Swiss-Prot record:
Originating species: Danio rerio
Coiled coil: 533-593
UniProt note: phenotype after gene disruption: The egy mutant embryos that lack detectable sart3 expression display microcephaly, microphthalmia and die by 7 to 8 dpf. Pharyngeal arch formation is defective resulting in a thymus devoid of lymphocytes and exocrine pancreas development is also impaired.
Comp. bias regions, Polar residues: 927-938
Region (Disordered): 1-58, 567-686, 905-938
Any one GO cellular component localisation term in the record: cytoplasm
Protein name: Spliceosome associated factor 3, U4/U6 recycling protein
GO molecular function: histone binding; U6 snRNA binding
Gene name, Swiss-Prot/TrEMBL: sart3
Key word Cytoplasm present: yes
Compartments reported by the entry: Nucleus, Nucleoplasm; Nucleus, Cajal body; Nucleus speckle; Cytoplasm
Amino acid sequence: MAATGNEEQTLLPDIEEEAEGMEREMESEDDEEEGMGVEHSEEEDEEDTSEDERENEAEIQRLEEQLSINAFDYNCHVDLIKLLRQEGKLHRLRKARQKMSELFPLTEEIWLDWLKDEIRITEDESDREKVYELFERAIKDYVCPEIWLEYVQYSIGGMGAQGGIERVRSIFERALTAVGLHMTKGASIWEAYREFEIVILSTVQPPPGTVPSQEQQELLSAQLERIHTLFRRQLAVPLMDMEGTYAEYSDWADDGVPETVTHQYRRALQQMEKGKPYEEALLVSEPPKLAEYQSYIDFEIKEGDPARVQIIFERALAENCLVPDLWIKYTTYLDRQLKIKDLVLSAHERAVRNCPWTMGLWKSYLLALERHGADHQTVKDVFEKALNAGFIQATDYVEIWQSYLDYLRRRVDFSKEWSRELDELRAAFSRSLEYLKQDVEERFSESGDLSCTLMQIWARIEALHCKNMQKARELWDSIMTKGNAKYANMWLEYYNLERSYGDAAHCRKALHRAVQCTSDYPEHVCDVLLNFERVEGSLEDWDAAVQKTETKLNRVCEQRARVAEKEALHARQEEEKAEQRRKVKADKKAQKKGQKANRTGDKRKAEDDDEEEWGEEAELPSKRLRGEDDFDSTVTEELMETESGLFGRRAPPARKTEPPGFRKNQQGAPEPQRQPHDMPKEQRKDENCVFVSNLTFNMEDPEGKLRTLFQGCGTIQQVRPVFTAKGTFRGYCYVQFEDRLAVPEALKMDRQEVDGRPMYVSPCVDKNKNPDFKVFKYKTSMEKHKIFISGLPYSATKETLEDLCKEHGTIRAIRIVTNRSGKSKGLAYVEFEDEAQASQAVLKMDGTMLENFTLSVAISNPPGRRMKDEAAPSRFLGAAMPRQLQGARGKGRTQISLLPRSLYRQSTPDAKAENGTISAPHATVTDGETSLDTQTKSLSNEDFARMLLKK
């Protein structure tokens, strides 16, 4: 210690001179900045009333007002800080940064800007201490080599103060511990440390030609040993450009590099070569590089060096701070492997600051606090913060309450009849039930604890530890009144509690109530009651139990028989409807074949045969169900000419003007005109073909245009556009490839805009051969990694949404919902890399404004789509009738119904509504006749006659 003091006294004059020189340089820079500031302030005074300043001030006030409403708006904080820094409002800028740092961990860029601004205005030693405190806060958020390098460089500027050199060395050592193992950036800290010590060495060396004293020689030897030690330590760490460091040490060391150092260097070099592929993968990949970091982490865990595992985790989290799974993996590793209190608790605290919506991180934090002996108030404060974190599921609140109650239970000494900890535990149980009932149900419309898990545990604690069966029974009575009395497992749980800690009378009472109320597994409950009476009961108890169970089981059998009868009736009705549909379809097919036989000419016949084989009419219904797009209610005349039953039966053939290109043969029939590239039917393969639809009807040369569009997918055998008899393009076609491998590439062009409309591309499948084939490619269930945005301006584009959402995470896909004409509906789906990013986007974007439109953002959970047979019933019987009533061109024929008007009305005035409609009996049409299907039987002509006579 004395040597250290003498060293500082010897070095102080030289250090003070260097410090004074640095201060003079800083003062000159400050003078220049002040001069620039004066000129700038004069310009500001001259342009004080400029429009830009007024706009900026108005924007600042708007941002501050928005933050007063929602303090957790991250983007608003960033915009406010950027604007205040631009305007040079230092006092307000400092307050804005301080407020943001209290709510969020700050990024490396924000911290560096803040630190540089504070360093620039530092004037005296007290201000330097404030900057030191700011650095200490900055290094706690993330492990950033740049911030550590800025920290050590700033500390060098204060080494002239009392104890300054030791302070600099202390900060350097902490920096090496934090980032010295960083394979690509750690070398900068090592080199800065060595350069600092070499500068110190130059100050302790005696002037040339003088004989150093013993004290000077000791100082010189100690300083040389420090530099040797730094070289040896660095060469033992796998870092990039190790060869250069080794060569530098070889030149610097007078006696050469020791063998032990060379051995450590070679071993570190081998380790560096193992990790080099992972570093190169990180170098060439795009942020946030999560997959590459995951591979790197797995490699380091397999290698088994805890320090290197820690640094790679920290590097990954610096770029993926909003990935809860990565934080969970890191904290779990620290809990199970390192178990260092300060390191573990710091990681848990940073985890919940970055991902506060993740319940699992809060739960792990509470366990870590208890594991490392944190005081009760600290655990309680962390739990209260967790309740205000804003979880996305009701069950998350149940789990965090469960973890906290477990902690409180472990604090209680149940050997005492009364304790303050026991009262606190009971109060916490009561508060948890109240919290779930009020706060959670108000937000999620459910408590999240349908099985009353918390109450069950409370009852078991009262029975087991407190010997208070009366309280346990009260709790179970409350559990059963919350809709759990029909479940056998709930009654058996209560029975087991009474069996363990109660008496036989209450066991018998519980089982009798269970037999009376259970509806899911009554046989099991009855068996438990009979077995109980075999062991515990008298003859009278046995007779009562047998009578009760027989009565219950007989009633259950009757109920099941009625249900089975209803199901059988429903199955028969469905089978009859299916048979009727098959019959109607067969009649239509026969009628269609008859129409074909009566047609004159071979050309029309060939065209119809081609269309039937390619399955175009079978494809159209599936295309109608694509995407979230609604089908236009007004169907164009061209689409209504389809020959299948999609939009109605084809109208009877009428005389038509023959389109251009038709010429009759000697018998008067038109000659067929095959397309130039049309191929025989037997050569067509559906697996090599795609169906293209929703094209504009006035497309010129559709074959040539589509051939150009799809030529990049593979070699095209044929493009077959479909035309009406008049020669009008129907808006859909088939593209046949030579190789089936081209089909997936063609399907990727689905929804591509062509002539202002989204082009639909789907597999070519014959629905007659594959009736269950579904074209709808988007999920109709909840997708937690995808968000649904409504309320968008119709002018919003994919680029607009990408700019809006990219700051919340990695975007995988953006889909704007459009109608068939390609116009936006103001709805969009944005798919993120993971659930955490989507949840963060919902929290940050919901309720924000875009071009004066208020956005509504939620997790994607589209409603299930109804199939044809599941369509909601209409208000009137006519709406449920087959489409043959509308004819080939919609409602071209008369709409007069021959059904009596009294039967055409709704069945009952109080019929239940479903999705905005009222159920009514189904009407069916067979061969032009309408009949009414009721739940009892169909009405005959005699029934209609009797009904008319009653009037």
